[in-house]
């Protein structure tokens, strides 16, 4: 298992790290694991958003993947958001979604239904090593 883990008061969510379309949900009181089917492959990062979960879809080896699912874990329903850029990592803050791609960072306003691009910026670091890349970020 090489995926990412998220937990709340009742459940632990994790992916296998494989190219499947499955997110696993473990009921912490019953020690029961169930599968939540997704519409996209490569589930990676799992972020809480209100009573739902954002799930990024990216092959971290190639840096390719342009989708994020918004999953309702109670019903199993999900909606896929497709982007013109790769989704390497993302963070949420209030109703904003910040997405790191291969060479840029994007700020989207999420109104519960649609993603609205508010800003984007290319990442250029002087003196950066020749074959290096930005692999993560955090919000304060």
Residue ranges: model-predicted function:
Residues 1-9, 38-50, 83-95, 125-140:
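Repeated scaffold domains used in trafficking and secretory/extracellular systems
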Residues 4, 17, 58, 102-103, ...:
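Surface loops and adjacent helix of pleckstrin homology
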Residues 8-9, 16-19, 29, 49, ...:
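Short loop/turn segments that connect beta-strands within the blades of beta-propeller domains
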Residues 14, 55-57, 99:
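Residue position within the beta-strands of beta-propeller blades
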Residues 20-25, 62-69, 104-109:
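Structural motif
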Residues 26-31, 71-76, 109-113:
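Short loop/turn segments that connect beta-strands within beta-propeller blades
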Residues 31-38, 76-82, 116-127:
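A short beta-strand motif characteristic of beta-propeller blades
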Residues 100-140:
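Blade-level signature of beta-propeller repeat domains, shared across WD40, Kelch, NHL, RCC1
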């Amino acid at each position: 298992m090489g995926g990412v883990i998220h937990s709340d008061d009742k459940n632990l969510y994790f992916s296998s790290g494989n190219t499947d379309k499955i997110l696993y949900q473990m009921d912490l009181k019953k020690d029961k694991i169930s599968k939540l089917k997704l519409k996209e492959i490569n589930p990676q990062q799992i972020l809480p958003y209100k009573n739902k979960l954002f799930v990024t879809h990216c092959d971290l080896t190639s840096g390719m993947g342009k989708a994020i699912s918004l999953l309702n874990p109670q019903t199993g329903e999900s909606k896929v958001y497709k982007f013109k850029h790769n989704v390497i990592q993302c963070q949420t803050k209030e109703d904003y979604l910040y997405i790191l791609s291969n060479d840029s960072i994007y700020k989207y306003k999420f109104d519960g239904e649609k993603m609205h691009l508010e800003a984007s910026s290319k990442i250029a670091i002087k003196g950066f090593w020749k074959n290096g890349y930005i692999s993560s970020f955090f919000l304060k």
